[in-house]
Swiss-Prot record:
The gene is ligA. The active site is at 122 (n6-amp-lysine intermediate). It catalyses: NAD(+) + (deoxyribonucleotide)n-3'-hydroxyl + 5'-phospho-(deoxyribonucleotide)m = (deoxyribonucleotide)n+m + AMP + beta-nicotinamide D-nucleotide. Belongs to the NAD-dependent DNA ligase family. LigA subfamily. Keywords: DNA damage, DNA repair, DNA replication, Ligase, Magnesium, Manganese, Metal-binding, NAD, Zinc. It comes from Pseudomonas entomophila (strain L48). DNA ligase that catalyzes the formation of phosphodiester linkages between 5'-phosphoryl and 3'-hydroxyl groups in double-stranded DNA using NAD as a coenzyme and as the energy source for the reaction. It is essential for DNA replication and repair of damaged DNA. This is DNA ligase.
């Protein structure tokens, strides 16, 4: 056998030993024999360097250090999971799944359907993506923000149980595998012992050790660390395989990818809870750290039907374990001032180690929480790291209270600016007029004249997901505020080179770059600008909803709270926060100053198609909380009377032609109140002013462009929801079905389309992708 043949044989044999050791947990040779084969291959490759390939087992040792990681955009976003902390949270998740799939159990008297779930431990490590092309590992990336991560390809190649090339056959030409890189408890102990012996820094816990090791610019350091990988799913694939989550993982295992040995199937939520309790009981005996378990709807078809909400799937949830707890002493309670002026208490603690991290501060949320706990300064308390991250005071140990323990007092003046601190009653708004007390918050009234509020407002405004002004970190913002150079976000656009260059940390080049970044920020998308304003309770996703649905800042500024509730995922409380923010004179002045600085908002335009299509006069009436009148009654009312004016003016005889006696009386009673009439007219007037229009005439399906045609929607549509696409197709006369048959006229297939697309191709049914569908609808006069 010549050298080339021997090298090929050794690689194949070592790959098989790796597969049996890391994936099957069935070592086939002693370690000494493996080492002998490995060293023989290493020696042969040294003699014949032209035969060295990237997928050789010897190429896991790491290469030259990088200056920095480059960015990688995830073709399919790496989404986070929703959390469940109590059994009731998990039961609520199961109920939402059952309702979302329209299974039995949605009403009070039906037996709850048992959904099939997959169950696996939630490893406490770092989420990564592995991209294989034609079976070869070509890229590794971190999760990052879910959309963009860091290219860690060189480092993931050093992780021993990540195959550099896939085993077997039948894998897709493009296969993105997702999973967790972690460090076992034993590996962590060995690493810390070695670090201590060498006089180096030890790590607080395995997760920090794994994350720090994987993100080393010098891959040789990564190669020396005991990292492991476990896959939990896939991202982009060139062709789908499997019809269940467990089926996909089992297939990945045959291709050499390690999956959890604790992977199980559960028939219904009770079996999920039993799995959670079992893993919890064995948690300390597992060879790795976990912080919960993950449950996923096993059927891929059901996953697609359930879809996503914001940045998390509706078909999966992480059931977290209770955080680890410790006793310590409250040395003092100090007050911090946040971006919105809220004055919040923070407990200063006698330092104590919790879950591997030294804790000296803990959140107390607000004074109501202090009252609930009965907390005094000097008390001994139980603290825990909520979600294993944020230290939180859970309970006061009263029998350890010292005689000199003193109550916590709210400052009457802001600890930062000296302005008055006011108590504001919080309310939880129902759909009607009633409010429910939700405690109180203390706020500094200094607004942007308070340095603490101003600093936090500017830090938020310049952040990467807001205006993305590079070069302005917290310390730089503090300097600008402390020097009196900025008193509102608008002052950023008045900064001059001479003012910046003299600041600590700035030189000529960095000063010019900062000013260039500030100038470049004058063309933000509408969503970024809304998010940057720092409206209470308005995060990145809500800002996108506002921008996408209302289409312009002018509409967002004047939108009534009731109109805002028509938007996806915006409830009445958040709607009032948005409305109140734009009603505030000071906020309007700051926005006017920003626009006057040369701000040019991008992506402004008409009302969003989804919002326009989903908002009807009947829908508006249903949201008014007219006694006894729900969506169906509202539809009947509009079908019979047609306009809001006629509905308001209708007498009992007119109303009873559309509704039953109780409903008719509810409508009359509601509109007897002049305030309700004014509210309804104001909402309608605003919607009409925004460009909405009510159509009272119903066309029959006959004569419509798609009359008699059956269409099917599959996959994920990115420019609209499937509900909107369905509604618009039905407007054109089509019937939208849930399955493909020989009678199907056309299938609209978005990313992730599976069995329905395959069936359409098999039957020769016409298929449109999303862009083609949008173009087709435009030809019919409908803009999506």
């Amino acid at each position: 056998m010549n050298a080339e043949s021997r090298i090929h044989a050794l690689r194949a044999e070592l790959d098989q030993h790796n597969y049996r050791y890391y994936v099957l947990d069935e070592p086939s040779v002693p370690d000494a024999e493996y080492d002998r084969l490995f060293n023989e291959l290493k020696a042969l490759e040294a003699e014949h360097p032209q035969l060295v390939t990237a997928d050789s087992p010897t190429q896991r040792v790491g290469g030259a250090a990088l200056a920095a990681f480059s960015q990688v955009r995830h073709e399919v976003p790496m989404l986070s999971l929703g959390n469940a902390f109590e059994e009731d949270d998990l039961r609520d998740f199961d109920r939402r799944v059952v309702e979302g799939l329209d299974l039995p159990g949605g009403d009070l008297f039906a037996a709850q359907a048992a959904v099939d779930y997959s169950c696996e431990p939630k490893l406490d490590g770092l989420a990564v993506s592995l991209l294989y092309r034609d079976g070869q590992l070509v890229q590794g990336a971190t999760r990052g923000d879910g959309t963009t991560g860091e290219d860690i390809s060189t480092n993931v190649r050093t992780v021993r149980n990540i195959p550099l090339k896939l085993q077997g056959e039948g894998w897709p030409a493009v296969l993105e595998v997702r999973g967790e890189v972690y460090m076992s408890k034993a590996g962590f102990d060995r690493l810390n012992a070695a670090q201590a012996e060498a006089g180096g820094k030890t790590f607080a816990n395995p997760r920090n050790a794994a994350a720090g090791s994987l993100r080393q610019l010098d891959s040789k350091i990564t190669a020396s660390r005991p990292l492991e990988f476990c896959c939990y799913g896939v991202g982009q694939v060139s062709e789908p395989f499997g019809d269940s989550h467990i089926g996909i993982l089992e297939k990945l295992k045959t291709w050499g990818l390690p999956i959890s040995r604790e992977l199980r199937h559960a028939a219904g939520i009770e079996e999920c809870l039993a799995y959670y309790r079992d893993i919890g009981a064995r948690r300390n005996d597992l060879p790795y750290e976990i912080d919960g378990v993950v449950f996923k709807v096993n059927s891929l078809a059901s996953q697609r039907e359930l879809g996503f909400r914001a940045r998390e799937p509706r078909w999966a949830i992480a059931h977290k374990f209770p955080a680890m707890e410790e006793l310590t002493e409250v040395l003092d309670v100090e007050f911090q001032v946040g971006r919105t002026g809220a004055v919040t208490p923070v407990a200063r603690l006698k330092p104590v180690k919790v879950a591997g991290v030294m804790v000296s501060n803990a959140t107390l949320h607000n004074m109501d929480e202090i009252a609930r706990l009965g907390l005094r300064i000097g008390d001994t308390v139980i603290i825990r790291r909520a979600g294993d991250v944020i230290p939180q005071v859970m309970q006061v140990v009263l029998d350890r209270r010292p005689e000199n323990a003193r109550p916590v007092e709210v400052p009457t003046e802001c600890p930062v600016c000296g302005s008055q601190v006011e108590r504001t009653q919080l309310v939880k708004r129902s759909k009607g007029k009633e409010t429910i007390s939700e405690g109180a918050v203390y706020r500094c009234v200094g607004r942007l004249s308070c340095a603490a509020q101003l600093k936090q407002a500017i830090i938020h405004y310049v952040s990467r997901r807001a205006m993305d002004i590079d070069g302005l970190g917290e310390k730089s913002v503090e300097q600008l505020v402390d020097e009196g150079l900025i008193r509102s976000p608008a002052d950023l656009y008045k900064l001059e080179f001479e003012q910046v260059v003299v600041l600590e940390g700035f030189a000529e080049v960095s000063s010019r770059k900062l000013l260039e970044a500030i100038e470049a920020s004058k063309r933000p998308s509408l969503a970024r600008f809304i998010y940057a304003l720092g409206i209470p309770d308005v995060g990145e996703e809500t800002a996108k909803v506002l921008a996408r649905s209302l289409g312009s800042l002018a509409r967002v500024q004047v939108a009534l709270p009731q109109v805002l509730t028509y938007l996806p995922d915006i409830g009445l409380e958040v709607a009032h926060e948005i409305h109140n923010f734009f009603e505030d004179t000071h906020n309007r002045e700051v926005i006017a100053q920003l626009l006057a600085s040369g701000m040019q908002l991008q992506e402004e335009g008409e009302l969003g198609a989804e919002f326009a299509a989903s908002t009807t006069l009947a829908g508006m009436l249903a949201k008014l909380d007219i006694p006894s009148v729900g969506p169906t009654g509202a539809e009947k009312l509009v079908d019979k009377l047609g306009t809001l004016d006629k509905i308001i003016a209708a007498d009992g005889i007119d109303l009873r032609q559309a509704l039953n006696t109780k409903q008719a009386e509810g409508v009359r009673e509601f509109f007897r109140d002049e305030a309700n009439q004014l509210l309804a007219r104001a909402i309608e007037a605003q919607l009409l002013d925004f460009g909405m229009h009510w159509s009272c005439e119903k066309r029959s399906a006959e004569g419509l462009p798609l009359a008699g045609q059956t269409w099917v929607l599959t996959g994920t549509l990115e420019r609209m929801s499937r509900d909107v696409a369905k509604e618009q197709l039905e407007r054109l006369g089509a019937k939208v079905a849930g399955s493909v048959s020989g009678k199907t006229h056309c299938v609209v297939a978005g990313p992730g389309a599976g069995s329905k697309l395959a069936k359409a191709n098999e039957l020769g049914v016409k298929v449109l992708d999303e862009e083609q569908f949008v173009a087709f609808m435009a030809e019919q006069g409908i803009t999506l």
